[in-house]
Amino acid sequence: MSDDRLGLGRERRFLVLLGIICLALIGGALYMQVVLGEAPCPLCILQRYALLLIALFAFIGAAMSSRRGVTVMETLVVICALAGAGVAGHHVYTQFYPSVSCGIDVLQPIVDSLPLAKIFPLGFQVDGFCSTPYPPILGLSLAQWALVAFVLTVILVPLGVVRNRKKTY
């Protein structure tokens, strides 16, 4: 097996792992919503969309056979992770300064009109306020954990590309 195919294989395995992790994070959010009664706010739902898109692009990228196709999907993964980091960062800011709410009356109709809110309302329909504090997990709020996950994705995907595609002479 050539070095080129080996590097692409590593990237594919990493993309599959990333997709599984994103789906697990969405599953964890649904568990907290349904079992623990933590109502999702508009920013929570937008973060779920970002995680879902990252998983989708990661799985598509893992199925691609060409280097160019994998690169395009990895680029889309990073773009979605940047968007998710922006939303999570705003969510963290809103939780630190509760007087600056996300405005459920402004974002709720927009988020609730997105297609998945109609198809799968349990997972993608707004129910709460962004400034509502929930118990932290290992010292961090859910928004902070989401921010960590998105930032790690933005850093690790390009690092994996550079590492796996480095030419040896």
UniProtKB/Swiss-Prot annotation:
InterPro entries: DiS_bond_form_DsbB/BdbC, Disulphide_bond_form_DsbB, DsbB, DsbB-like_sf. Its main location: membrane. It holds the Pfam family DsbB. GO terms for biological process: protein folding. It is found in: Cell inner membrane. GO terms for molecular function: electron transfer activity; protein-disulfide reductase activity. It is a multi-pass membrane protein. GO terms for cellular component: plasma membrane. Disulfide bonds join 41-44, 102-130. Belongs to the DsbB family. NCBIfam families: PRK02110.1. Required for disulfide bond formation in some periplasmic proteins. Acts by oxidizing the DsbA protein. This is Disulfide bond formation protein B 1. It comes from Pseudomonas fluorescens (strain ATCC BAA-477 / NRRL B-23932 / Pf-5). The gene is dsbB1.
